[in-house]
Structures are given as C-alpha cells and as structure tokens.
C-alpha cells in the first residue's frame, strides 16, 4: 500500500441531537454538522483519548468502563462518514468499483451503524449490526436519493 505518513488510526465520537419534526433533510444535515463541529477541533479530538485513558488508566473495573462507553457512545443510530475520497481506480489488472465502510460496532445491544463513503463521486453505504434492523439501509438510501433528487 505504501501509505507512509498518510496512514493513521483516528478515533472520536460526538453526538448530535436534533428535532426532525420541524426540518427537511438538508436542514437536519446542517444542524447535525453544526452540532458535531465543536468536537472536530484539534483540542477536542486530542482530549477524547485522554478521557478514555483517565478512566482505563485509573484501574477502573469493567462495569465503570462499560458505563463510560455507554454514555459516550449513546445513540439511536451511529452514522460514520469517511468523507469524499478521490484516488486512482486502476491497480494493475484490478479496478476499484466502490469502497464500503467504515464498518463500526461499539458493542452495544441493538446498535445500528450506517457507514458512508464517497469515492470518486459514488456514494457507498454499509449497514453494520449484530441484529440488523430490516429495511434500515434501504430506507436510508431512499431518503438520500429523494433529498439529492430534490436539490437537482
């Protein structure tokens, strides 16, 4: 892969709470983006692992760590987004058609994760769960398709 300094492990979590009754899709998306923006600063990103190290490093028992994780990762649905990626599609005889992910499970019962990646202009969605909610991926795709068609 020869990724060099372009490869790393980046972890973080933030929660966005919004009222879906009064807004259309794009208003919700803007509201969610504003809700997580404060946690996207370098200071906030650096502080998140420090909080975890403080809990784990103090010799906390399993129940304390589980309670901390449940609080930090509490959500109805987890949405992960790698953003808009652009790179070569051809790797010798192999052509990259899509990338699906990220596939994330925080380990909570009933957790539903939608991983979003846009590669060379193609939106790719992945539903990850130990107990997948039937139709969630299809509904997500439908909502996104309608929202994007509306903007055109």
What are these regions (language model features)?
Residues 1-152:
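Acyl-thioester-dependent acyl-group transfer interface
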